[in-house]
């Protein structure tokens, strides 16, 4: 029996009820999770897979809340995240040492992001690697430079974001206009009686929050490991320029690096872009080799 064919609860019957129901599924200890994963891997035991899926439905819902600002029904976003969770359970290898939550976060986010991109493609939202990065990182980049105003960004803000994300100014302007709709409020009622709000459900999820924090710490460690391995593949100059431009809290300017290396500002920018593309390619290949993403 395939994991994808498992009967998993859906928020289609009412989001408030769904969120209440999934809280009834117990979390798994590390030993329980390992045992269930082995049962699925060795015997294709559907009950083992089902327990792994249901014990992580709250994790999916919590991750999905982070994508509520893209104008799509949150129930549909959760459903797509559940698809990613089932894929993670199918491919999970417990002997590699990390928990299912850590591994599943990659799949849940990828599934949700692909769904959002498919939905936004109806208005011809681009799907190049750079546009995907811009689509999912623009809000964070705006907050980092305190660009909280409504409407168009100031030219200096556009330039800062474009440099940080490695895209064109025009792409930042276009994407900002497409994503300028208001976010769903955390104070929006979950039920018709108005007694339960999004923030109530999120704040009460102490156990899943702890698991999420552990998973995020493990995921960060995995990403750092991939980054360190990929950096070795760069030349000394590429590594230095990329570090100075993209990995420091206070990036060195193109002009400063150009003076340091005795080349033009444009040449430094080209080296930075080339190094970043090489780094991304190497990290993705490593992630595929570790079975973290699809080829």
Swiss-Prot record:
Superkingdom of the source species: Bacteria
Pfam families: Sigma70_r1_2 (PF00140), Sigma70_r2 (PF04542), Sigma70_r4 (PF04545)
UniProtKB keywords: Cytoplasm, DNA-binding, Sigma factor, Stress response, Transcription, Transcription regulation
GO molecular function terms listed in the Swiss-Prot or TrEMBL record: DNA binding; sigma factor activity
DNA-binding region extent: 254-273
Sigma-70 factor domain-4, as annotated region: 230-281
Keyword Iron: no
Subunit structure: Interacts with the RNA polymerase core enzyme.
PANTHER family cross-referenced by the UniProt entry: RNA POLYMERASE SIGMA FACTOR RPOH, SIGMA FACTOR RPOH HEAT SHOCK RELATED
Annotated function: Sigma factors are initiation factors that promote the attachment of RNA polymerase to specific initiation sites and are then released. This sigma factor is involved in regulation of expression of heat shock genes.
Name by which UniProt lists this protein: RNA polymerase sigma factor RpoH
Source organism of the structure: Caulobacter vibrioides (strain ATCC 19089 / CIP 103742 / CB 15)
Gene: rpoH
